[in-house]
Amino acid sequence: MKMLDLYGYTSIAQSFDKICISIASPESIRAMSYGEIKDISTTNYRTFKVEKGGLFCPKIFGPVNDDECLCGKYRKKRYRGVICEKCGVEVTSSKVRRERMGHIELVSPVAHVWFLKSLPSRIGALLDMPLKLIESILYSGDFVVIDPIATPLSKGEVISESAYNQAKDNYGEDSFIALTGAEAIRELLVRLDLHAINANLRSELESTTSEMKRKKIVKRLRIVENFINSGNKPEWMILTVIPILPPDLRPLVSLENGRPAVSDLNHHYRTIINRNNRLGKLLKLNPPAIMIRNEKRMLQEAVDALFDSTRRSYVSNKAGSVGYKKSLSDMLKGKQGRFRQNLLGKRVDYSGRSVIVVGPNLKLHQCGLPKKMALELFKPFICSKLKMYGIVPTVKLANKMIQNEKPEVWDILDEVIHEHPILLNRAPTLHRLGIQAFDPVLIEGKAIQLHPLVCSAFNADFDGDQMAVHIPLSLEAQLEARILMMSTNNILSPSNGKPIIVPSKDIILGIYYLTLQDYVEPEEILFFGDFSHVEYALHNKDIHICSKIKYKMNYCTDSSDGSGPTYYSKIVETTPGRLMLWQIFPEHKNLTFDLVNQVLTVKEITAIVDLVYRSCGQSETVEFSDKLMSLGFRYASQSGISFGRMDMIIPDTKTMHVDNASEKIKEFAVQYQDGLITKSERYNKVIDEWSKCTDLIAKDMMKAISVYDEESKLNSIYMMAHSGARGSASQMKQLAGMRGLMAKPSGEIIETPIISNFREGLNVFEYFNSTHGARKGLADTALKTANSGYLTRRLVDVAQDCIVVEYDCKTHNGFAMRSVIDGGTVVETLDNIILGRVAAVDIYNPITEELLVNAGELIDEAKVEKIRIAGLDAVKVRSPLTCEAKKGICALCYGRDLAIGDVVSIGEAVGVIAAQSVGEPGTQLTMRTFHVGGTAMRGVETSNLIAMLDAKVKLVNSNVVEDKYGNKIVMSRSCDVVLLDSVGNEKMRHSVPYGARLYVNDGQLVKITEKIADWDPYTMPIITEKTGIIKYMDLIDGVSINEVLDESTGISNRVVVDWKLHLQGANLRPRLVLVNDNGDIITLSSGLEANYFIPIGAVLSVQDGQKVHAGDVITRIPRESIKTRDITGGLPRVIELFEARRPKEHAIVSDIDGYVEFGKDYYRSKRRIFIKPVDDKLSPVEYLVPKGKHTIVNEGDFVHKGDLLMDGDPDPHDILRVLGVEALANYMIAEIQQVYRLQGVRIDNKHIEVILRQMLQKVEIFEPGDTMYLIGENVDVEEVLKTNSNMEKIGKSPAKYIPILQGITRASLDTNSFVSAASFQETTKVLTEAAFSGKEDSLYGLKENVIVGRLIPAGTGFLMNKIKKLSLLNKDDYSMYYNSEYQDLASIEAGHACSVSPSQGVSDTSGAVDY
């Protein structure tokens, strides 16, 4: 401990290792108490002194004033410890009034409401009685038989009062024992033999076959075992003594008008004392039983109200109603409760807040701090300096001097703030970049000045935003602020590793303007050899910034023979503006003039900043960014780019496009009238046509607007949008093209578009149509912000204890990563996915067999390039999901820390970073919904497949038939078209839907833009495989099929309806059968009969008895109308995935490989599908599909394990059960990333993997072996592995288990730390569970340590924790400990400690760590 004393580390918070919780026994309550309270008096109404013996009694709770007894006989510190003989008060510090407890001795026992009513009722479970019965005993005066003695009554039988009286008359007064109220329950609990119950339940569990009964037994068994293991006694759940909180925690505060404001708890205690005293007096008087019962019930209700008012049975006095008094439970739970209000979030002193304004003259590490604020915030520092320099003798005079703002004060303030970083924070703090450190620069005025480049990290703008300032006081805090939190040390975003300190808005515009080049060729191109000559020519206006010039550029390369650098020069054609920009670039071989010699938009500028950071390091990047900013601002103002009405050029072709679209829509209406297409098909075609028309107009507008004009040069609005400074193509489309289609709040698209644009102005009808989107945007913003904030909170809670605990867990497991292909195009390359990960196995070039990356080596940019050249399409890398580290993860499985670009440091809280990275964009995006103003963002449905490159076609699972026109029709439901390059590597894969027309053969070579296949995107067809005659089976008019007349067209369609609603429809199986000329059913190539089952809502395309050809469509299933998908649709999807909810219309997944067979229907509602395995020895697996749901497999189809059998999203739990963890991870990552990708947000996969790891912490036992686990029990993975290894050591059989997926809320509540779970949600439930189980909290996570007031075990605190643990061990234990769990201390000491890497300007980190 001496070692810790150096750091002042032996405070109460540090002096314990874990927290235990259990039920308090009456003895322990009395032991904690300093005296019994029998009186309800509080203070004397005249003297306002506290009354002796009352709820604030100084004799019991301690003196009201420091070192002063109540009567005033003893006053002063010297009498400390003396007990006044007159008033009986101990002379001590008044602080004890926050610690000393009292108690009430109850005349009659009462049940503790938490154990009674918190479901499942613990008292009910132990006694095996329903809650209703127990309540009737406690509140309604029913009796329970304790001991039947010689009567036919049974033990535990509940009888009413009249039955009790009757039994007494029949059997005699003493022939049996029956009691009522809490005494009865207590007596039953005392008589319980838990060990016997445990043995009985276990034997019952083995013999039972009913699943429901098994679940019930398991529930009860768990509660019984928890009681046995924890050492709690069941009768402690019935209270005979009630503790009273120390008085300073329930104070009496006098208001301005002199009336006292009483804490609600005092009201509860008074009621209890009153009723208890009254009951005591009553019992002495021997009154009628009904009076006693009533008084006992009132006492029970008073105690219930004290512990938890919300669980009371009667409705009045519920939370929120007038006169509601807060109970102890209310003080713990919710946002205003003790945990979240006072323990996890506290108000901070030495802080201030003010409006922010832009500070374009600041350096990146600086912020402008108003002098007035600085003076107040740094007051103690100034006082001490004034005293130290002898300017003032006392602190009081120093304060006066500061108040008068004497000149000396300002000089000292300058000295005090020199190199003293301050923290700036902008709410909402959605990720760690919401708080950053800066060096303050004193400024006049009252607003804080902020550097423009950090705005994107803070998500700040200057329209009235406010920011808070905090001062790190201690030297350690200042050191951490400078090294870890300084804005210059946070250049990269922790969520995707791309720079976040990048120019935006005006800066981009200035740089874009600077790199533009005149389109008009000058009469003669001037030639320059030196930049000073260019500046001279610019000054004399001989040339313009954008003029074309020739310049002699000097280059330097490394010579091939290694003799040193070679210099050469080259003439380049460029502009003065680009040369100006080139001057600020740092020198490095990776930074060539070609980077600048082009028109730079936001994309290129971001890439340049990234390249500068990767090539030249941090300090160069910071300098470069600052120079880039000032250059950008300067030329944005010089360029004179403005926003003019005439810049919005409406294309001449607009009317033509609109007319064409209108004509087509009339055509669709005619087709619909003639019954060629259905209503939904017409709607979908109309929507598509208008989308196409809007896109064409937008394209023409962009063409017109981007034309270089002799007079006005380039169009200003085009420059703003094209550079990426402000606005987007979709906003410009609305300004000068046409507004397009609008969405209703429900998400449906209104089929009449807004043809006008904002320049022309909208008519009344169009304006009214626009209001939908605008209002939806505002309502969404309010609702979704709350939703997204709650998602972030749950994510942080589930991942908070995921910390990097060691360097390498030595695992060889990992996942194969592939590039992400969506709709045939590569949306995420393999390079991006594997960058910054660690290889799980050696990676070789498949052709040359050269070793590219060793197993366990970080894949950096250079290695990614090697892998890309080698043409690998999959790489196995380590993942947080497969990490084998205990109580956290290892650095190598995590890979690169995206914020510093190097392997993650030990002690990094990667869980919280992951949660912030996933949660932060959710909030951002929801806030961004209304910017487009509700116009429908939706592409045209893809209906064909075009080759994107010259390639060779490979068809996978292609079962095709030829129709009467000679077209090849795809009959397989899992047909893929793969395009291979000349080497045979897969370049593109696209699934082709059932019913598509295929234009290529297997092995055929295709040219770029050649059509491969097409299909109808609006309907799902059912197609015949052979030629024959159609016969209706079970398609009965009015029962399973209806003629639906379309009123607008007068045409009727035959639609299949829900036949289950009819009595005679019970056993129908509506289908179309294909027969030959003799009427025999045709056999298909699979060997099965040609039966085509028809789902509800399908439209029949053939008549009974009609002849059909192979490849004909016999039924069409219309797809539902298309809805727009933005993050408002996307955020609930992300929540659904993280909560691991079963999708509403979830698909059924095949558990095995095999052939599909349709069985006999199950009652009215379900269809039976069998999957017959390939191996005949195995029995088929049965699935029940709701009738009328469209199955996407046909009889005889071969399905693989994990294939879907019907429409819908698969259930993640099914994927885990059938295909395992890797398939689940791939599915979840793909689905979550798809939502974010739609919004253009990049999140690294590893963040999602970290959250998934936390969701997969539990396993389900299906065979307990010789362990004490129960079947179906959910246990922690680490705990099972530990138990199993112990079992194997003693030669017993271990438990068998399967991994289970928990939603983030469930996982947070099931965590090993009850302190963390209680502070998250369902506080009373968690604490009840923890108390009767006698849980221990070892304080491993971050939250638990914040709550008990310690340094968190992450970052710098991680090392302090290790030192603390090592300092508590003796020499022998130390070496064992060091060798086993802490072999990584050496690697920590070598510089892996607190996220500091040498590139961050700290030359030697070992000195910072080697204590």
From Swiss-Prot:
InterPro entries: DNA-dir_RpoC_beta_prime, DNA-dir_RpoC_beta_prime_bact, RNA_pol_asu, RNA_pol_N, RNA_pol_Rpb1_1, RNA_pol_Rpb1_3, RNA_pol_Rpb1_3_sf, RNA_pol_Rpb1_4. Zn(2+) 2 binds at C809, C883, C890, C893. Mg(2+) binds at D461, D463, D465. Keywords: DNA-directed RNA polymerase, Magnesium, Metal-binding, Nucleotidyltransferase, Transcription, Transferase, Zinc. GO terms for biological process: DNA-templated transcription. It holds the Pfam family RNA_pol_Rpb1_3. Its EC number is 2.7.7.6. The keyword Isomerase does not apply. NCBIfam families: rpoC_TIGR. PANTHER family: DNA-DIRECTED RNA POLYMERASE (PTHR19376), DNA-DIRECTED RNA POLYMERASE SUBUNIT BETA (PTHR19376:SF54). The RNAP catalytic core consists of 2 alpha, 1 beta, 1 beta' and 1 omega subunit. When a sigma factor is associated with the core the holoenzyme is formed, which can initiate transcription. This is DNA-directed RNA polymerase subunit beta'. The gene is rpoC.
